[in-house]
Amino acid sequence: MFNGKKKALTFSYDDGVTQDIRLVEILNKYGLKSTFNLNSELLGKDGSLDIKEKKISHTKINPSEISKIYKGHEIAVHTLTHPNLTKLGDKEIIRQIEQDRLNLSNLLGYEIVGMAYPGSQPNYNSQISQIIEDHTGVKYARTTICNKDFSLQRDLFEFHPSAYHLDWEILYKLADQFISLEPTTDKIFYIWGHSYEFDINNEWDKFEEFCKFISNKDDIFYGTNKQILLN
């Protein structure tokens, strides 16, 4: 399924912050691929978050730089302005998602088909996922509920990632399992997060070590969410 391979690894990062620049450099160094989920009406805006008594930059990448910075990776929907979709009516849910998809498609010059739900849990429900499937051009949508699993999932509109990128113990445990697997059916190792979170405890080096560990395996296909989920 994955270029003749049974195992595939993919990453997914939200918000389109300037820390993505460093992240892309690391991913490219090790031949890894990610999907980056952007809010088109927030692009270029300055911002910061107060986390653990630290002020962490949450400044968004400028629209004019998107194509260059994310070259070789996938761009996907994260809604126009990052609302909690469970608090919105149906029409606004559709507008937030479909207009973001159209904006990003126009910006990138190709059709955007992926999505990640914005905000902390609960940030979606089955009614919302059905609205997305029925009324937008989105073909898959990722949740923030990690399942610690590699199995293929039937419902691509409530797609659960395997692991969160800062859960190091779980990440390495799953990575060891994934590397050792000799599956007869297709398996996906899906990792998600936000690149600004590496700044909180300065964990960039730890992430690079993980990338080095999981990369360059002959039996693993390294691709974007779209390449793997819509194969």
Where are these regions (language model features)?
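Short glycine/proline-enriched loop/turn "hinge" motifs that connect secondary-structure elements
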Residues: K68-I69, S180-T185
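Histidine-centered catalytic micro-motifs
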Residues: I75-H82
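C-terminal domain-boundary segment and adjacent tail
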Residues: M1-N3, K29-G31, T35, S40, ...
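Active-site beta->alpha N-cap acidic-glycine motif
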Residues: M1-E74, N103-P118, Y190, D219, ...
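Active-site metal-binding loops of divalent metal-dependent hydrolases
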Residues: Y13-G16, T79, S195, N225
